[in-house]
């Protein structure tokens, strides 16, 4: 054996059984240690650090006493073991034994020196090395901002929406819309377009569909198939850090150890939860079935399926803000008490097969997929819709996501330089949004308002006759055909292929370890979209449509990174330095704004004038004087739609009249006065110069960046760790930000333009924090674990959607009114600062937890280039007829610019017409949980208190308060009837509080469920 301070002697793996007597008075502790299994991933390293890792991953208390571990190196331990088998494997043939004891009802291991001269008696249970009562102990001994959501925590209250999985995590929120199953995650105020790397088993979920900019990035995940969720906030240094400015969230699926019990080759787990009748409040059924088998020593397979059925639900009846649940109806306000169109049907599947190639390496194939159907709805309106609520159902939606991966791992026990992980994966997410046919409130000429007659008229005149598919229709007829009488199916797809490779090499120098983690990551996202139309089940193609959905553009973006991190640590300190180089490339097609000359034919001008009055919606004859005008203009509009110019000329020459409400006959009113009864003279063809137009444009952009990071931690006592970090990160523009183009659906209120000049975002983040673990706080053997931190992220060129951009050639010197939209870079620094806290208390029969997030500072300010694509050609730099220049040009010269265009290109203007989540400061939030374990720990019950602060959406520009302060209470319980059966019950929102989830989708404003009661059962074999 080498002496302490030199390289430690490895303890080879061995089947040699050490004598391990159980402590007196604890005959059942050994059986409990045999039954409990854990998934371990512990490399060969100094024994002291190895047993620390064992305690953390096993979730047990471990005591060293006087045992000297400095001369030993552990055996690498990976895979699923019982607690006893795992510790035996870790210790190998070292002369170290253990005793099992119980402190305050908790399972504990105490190490014993069984070597020559060693004392085999049980030493005093001091000092404590580590106490690991749950897997979350990994949180409180990690010198960084990391949180873990365990399966136990997921099971306390049924998960209706995936956003509930991370709602208790500090620094994390979700722009949840409870009518839409898509999950969007916000970390420290940042979200969308990959700022948060959202993953399932390390596979990126990069799907994006555009809407009202509340969720530009969604994933679909089923909580029934998960074992835990790992949340890292801030700069991510390892293999999952590419392009992630805010952090990462990895939802990890069930593993073999979650289904197979120790010593069993076959395992089955069945779960089911349902709402309790009327009190279930929309929880119809949530359940799953998982089975696993071990074939010999080298092959394991597992399969699982799940189903989730959620319905509409009632909102709370107490609290809330006066009028919060009311909408306008017939000049007054009415209240609504439920959320319509929240029903969702989700089916998911999971499959894994692991082949153990040798003791050191394995190959894993995995698949996880989900399919969910739900309603395609509008955002909340201030007026009552047909449902009696703010929401209107537009149609149906279907989402399907499939993820495949192949993982290879090798970690030789005798080679500390090799700890290699390789992953190749593919993810495909498809969403279909089907919009059912709609019809106007009145016939275009105001002739009638009966809904059935309107539908019959449009179907017969435009669709059944095939008129909407003929190329010679007027512009107005084209608008009719695009909007009414036809169903539209938007199909969106994102395909992601990725490759990850990282290795960790370790060098042991006595009690100090130097590790190097290095590797590469590459992934590519390919987005496609199309539209299909149908009328009464027949596929049609309205004239003027292409089948493309430019608001969800087609393109490809690839990103790659190479990284390394060096870490030096011992029992007192940890210091690390990392460096990564990342590069991206984006290619796609879009349309950029420009100018053109537009030719208006005689028929075009006639149709424009006639139909502007004859198609005034919502009015019928004799309802008001305007309808009398419509009764004359209507025939003119119909003639324009028919396109018969000879009939138009005859009708125009007839000088139509109408009778007003007083019975007086009046001549046909023409804006500006009737000038000629000759159709050809009155409506002259015209060429309009300098008209806005869109031109096809191929985008190909690429860039790279070097990103350093530093961190350090010290542990001055056995209960305190203080850490700090600083690092740079970036995020290149996404496909939608560069390529999206089109008009707001239906009403055309806004025009959206691409920004192929968008610059990458860059940020600097620094944070400080502390971990503490106190023992014997209130009871013998209890522990109190706390993590607190401060973060400060400052981002440059943060991309946001501006609603008032100026197009090239507009000749404007200030921003227009909202309506012209594009993604632009914020020329003001965007700041995100706050405090995070979480803690746990564990005393065996009683336990608790808490978390809190407080955001500092006010809402961010947003400034943009006056011309985001450049000012372009303009009239101010053109000389007048006398050779002089306009005043604007002269002012630019006086300011030191060579032209007005140069001045305009250099201007930055500040405004807050921002249309996405960045305009809103996240709300403060917190949770407090207290639980007890009774009846020999078979009964586990507790209460959870939830708090959310208030928040505004675009407060500086007159935006309204969307999120109001609230508190709620939940109760949960589980009873382990025997080794195979566990019963579960919960009551969510006990006080039936009315509230909108804090920092949820500001446009959807879907209320959270009121009081909900659920019962469940889990059966394992």
Regions found by a protein language model. Give the residues of each.
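Extracytoplasmic beta-strand/coil segments of soluble accessory domains associated
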Residues: 110, 163, 167-204, 233
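Short acidic/polar hinge/loop motifs at secondary-structure boundaries
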Residues: 205-235
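Membrane-embedded beta-barrel scaffold of Gram-negative outer-membrane proteins
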Residues: 272, 419-435, 715, 721-727, ...
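Transmembrane beta-barrel wall of Gram-negative outer-membrane proteins
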Residues: 279-310, 314-315, 319-377, 400-404, ...
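Flexible loop and strand-edge segments within Gram-negative outer membrane beta-barrel domains
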Residues: 340-342, 346, 360-415, 429-439, ...
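Structural signature of Gram-negative outer-membrane beta-barrels, strongest in the C-terminal barrel
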Residues: 358, 513-525, 550-793, 929-931
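Gram-negative outer-membrane beta-barrel transporters
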Residues: 569-575, 584, 778-799, 803-955, ...
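C-terminal beta-signal and adjacent terminal beta-strands/loops
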Residues: 730, 794-797, 801-803, 844-846, ...
